[in-house]
């Protein structure tokens, strides 16, 4: 089976969806990524278009890996896309309670990575995950204050790293932490399955 996890964006923030699966070798893999950034686009995708994109992404992954879906996760604070998806396809995305402690969410995902049972398939769509993962950091002032907050600033991608996502059929010119958020939601929603909680 495979899982999906969504960090839903708005007018200025990207929507990211990771597809995760357990391999025969016992490793968990990020198989593929849907990524749509509305930045620098005069006409932004509406929730109905994002809903359609995500459903088609799921359908393509199920077909490619010849399997079924176990869990579809989304940020509990996101209502518009969740409602649109249910209205369009009758599927209830599982709202994960991310809580108020971002540090705890990050700890869960770091604990999972520390188990050395997670790998990222090297394909073009997953490059944005790699980029955001390598550049994920706390805001220095927030660390000093004792309440660490991730840096959510949209940063420009270098010209030689122009990113095109085949599932959203669009370019992204900036990156931030969207794939890292959906990864954290996936880990939090699957603690038992991932061997982090018994």
Name each model-derived stretch.
Residues 18, 25-172, 193:
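Mg2+-dependent endonuclease catalytic cores in nucleic-acid-processing enzymes, primarily RNase H-like
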Residues 1-11, 75:
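Two-metal-ion RNase H-like nuclease active-site motif
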Residues 161, 181-189:
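Short, hydrophobic/amphipathic alpha-helical patches that form generic packing surfaces
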Residues 156, 174-184:
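Short, charged alpha-helical segments
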Residues 2-4, 15, 70, 180:
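Residue-level detector of short, conserved catalytic/binding motifs and their immediate flanks
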Residues 10-14, 26:
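Coil-to-beta-strand transition motifs
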Residues 13, 81, 178-182:
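Catalytic-loop motifs flanking and including active-site residues across diverse enzymes
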Residues 186-198:
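Acidic two-metal-ion nuclease catalytic site recognized across multiple nuclease folds
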């Amino acid at each position: 089976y495979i899982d999906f996890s969504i960090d839903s964006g708005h007018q200025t923030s990207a929507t990211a969806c990771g597809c995760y699966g357990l391999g025969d070798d016992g490793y968990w893999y990020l198989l593929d990524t849907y990524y749509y950034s509305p930045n620098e686009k005069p006409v932004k995708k509406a929730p109905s278009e994002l809903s359609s994109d995500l459903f088609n992404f799921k359908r393509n992954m199920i077909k490619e890996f010849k399997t079924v879906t176990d869990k579809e996760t989304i940020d509990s604070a996101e209502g518009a896309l969740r409602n649109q998806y249910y209205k369009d396809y009758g599927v209830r995305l599982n709202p994960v309670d991310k809580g108020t402690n971002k540090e705890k969410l990050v700890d869960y995902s770091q604990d999972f990575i520390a188990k050395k049972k997670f790998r990222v398939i090297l394909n073009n769509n997953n490059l944005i995950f790699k980029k955001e993962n390598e550049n994920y950091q706390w805001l220095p002032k927030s660390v000093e204050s004792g309440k660490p907050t991730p840096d959510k600033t949209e940063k420009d991608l270098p010209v030689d790293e122009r990113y095109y996502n085949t599932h959203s059929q669009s370019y992204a010119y900036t990156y931030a932490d969207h794939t890292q958020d959906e990864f954290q939601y996936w880990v939090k929603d699957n603690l038992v399955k991932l061997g982090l909680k018994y």
